[in-house]
Amino acid sequence: MKTIEVKILDPRMQEQLPAYATAGSAGLDLRACLDAPITIKPGETHLVPTGLAIHLADPGYAAMILPRSGMGHKHGIVLGNLVGLIDSDYQGQLMVSTWNRGQTEFTLNPMERLAQLVIVPVLQVGFNVVEEFDTSERGIGGFGSTGKH
């Protein structure tokens, strides 16, 4: 298992480090490091601190902050930026852009699991400018071009 550096910015996080819920989990749960509950009205967004900073250091990796499926499905709580991309050289606090796309108010409590952190490999590329591409089976077919079923 690869390890990454983590800085605890809020002492409450000492006992609440992100962890995999099961042996097969891809994401580490992130918690809302709040001093008091916040109520998020329909259509509102809040930037919620996690109390943690990470430093991946290796440009071959990035982190993604993703929604927890139950939060979106049951409560309409998703990420305001849809996916949070954390570059390998970022060292600031992890923040979760939280958007209530539902129809009712949602109360987020201190230390509630809010999102998940997934570490992914990254390949940095250069560009080879061409006039034309070699022909492929798909060509320029875009949205819906491979059929409905």
Swiss-Prot record:
GO terms for biological process: dUMP biosynthetic process; dUTP catabolic process. Substrate binds at residues 68-70, 81, 85-87, 95. It catalyses: dUTP + H2O = dUMP + diphosphate + H(+). It is an enzyme of class 3 (hydrolase). Its EC number is 3.6.1.23. Pfam families: dUTPase. Its cofactor is Mg(2+). It comes from the Bacteria. InterPro entries: dUTPase, dUTPase-like, dUTPase-like_sf, dUTPase_trimeric. CDD domains: trimeric_dUTPase. One of its GO terms (molecular function) is dUTP diphosphatase activity. Pathway: Pyrimidine metabolism; dUMP biosynthesis; dUMP from dCTP (dUTP route): step 2/2. This enzyme is involved in nucleotide metabolism: it produces dUMP, the immediate precursor of thymidine nucleotides and it decreases the intracellular concentration of dUTP so that uracil cannot be incorporated into DNA. This is Deoxyuridine 5'-triphosphate nucleotidohydrolase. It comes from Janthinobacterium sp. (strain Marseille) (Minibacterium massiliensis).
